[in-house]
Amino acid sequence: MIITHKIKWDKCLSHQIWSAIEKGWPDEGRPVHFFWGLAGNNIAGIRECIEKNEEYYFVDTGYISSQITRYPEPKILDEKKTYFRICKGSFHTNIGKVNTPARLEKLIKLGIDAEFKGWRADDRGKHILLCPSSPTVTFQMNGITQDEWIEVAKREIKKYTDREIRLRNKPRPGNKWWGTDIKDDLKDCHALVTNYSLSAFDALLNYIPVFAEANSVMGPVTSRDIKKIEKQENGDLPFLNRRFSEL
């Protein structure tokens, strides 16, 4: 039985996605749940699935994809370039299947930035960019508020570097980051630190090393050891592109 958990807001993109899931996902005669993000009653619904040991999938915007418009209402701008992630039993893809280069080549031909190009040739970075996940994700995954996570991260970073720490939160209408481009903050950036933010992709695609949680989507190609923030041990190009191909 395919169960798509509906969001009441009629503009939510899930209403477009669920019709495709309900039509095309094989029904194996047991409850299989689908949740769009963490809105509505989804957090409680996911907890119930875990308690009942019922299969569930978390659906949200894709990792390597053309971006959607979010405000004032979400819109898919280009269906051919837009992908969504469907993660089994997790908010993020932690285990992937290595694909042939064909998929990445297809994305690149569509004009999507999908290729790891290497690391900076020199150490010209000046600041650390701190990019927390949303308050909801931070609380669910780290068990503390976003503000608490930011303060903990700042204290830890300051133990090992005296570089400026620059905060960048998710751009939302009315906040200071609304209408800005993360690429501007990545200029002269030494490293990006996050818990689960997809800003890790932006950094890696722009030659910047990343420190992130082990169970984040980019955990396999990022570091946890803040002690090494001045002298990162960066992964090699084939390994990072292989990870991109899994997503």
Please tell me what each predicted stretch does.
Residues 1-44, 136-137:
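N-terminal pre-catalytic "stem/leader" segment of glycosyltransferase-like enzymes
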Residues 3-9, 131, 136, 144-183:
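Catalytic donor nucleotide-activated moiety binding site of glycosyltransferases and closely related
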Residues 9-10, 38-41, 62-65, 133-137, ...:
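Short, solvent-exposed loop/turn segments at secondary-structure junctions
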Residues 11, 73-125, 221-247:
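Leloir-type glycosyltransferase catalytic cores
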Residues 26, 158-211, 215-216:
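Donor nucleotide-activated moiety binding/catalytic core segment of transferases
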Residues 26-60, 188-195:
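Short, well-ordered secondary-structure micro-motifs within conserved domains or adaptor modules
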Residues 55-57, 63, 165, 210:
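Hydrophobic beta-strand scaffold residues
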Residues 66-74:
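Phosphate/adenylate-binding glycine loop and adjacent helical scaffold
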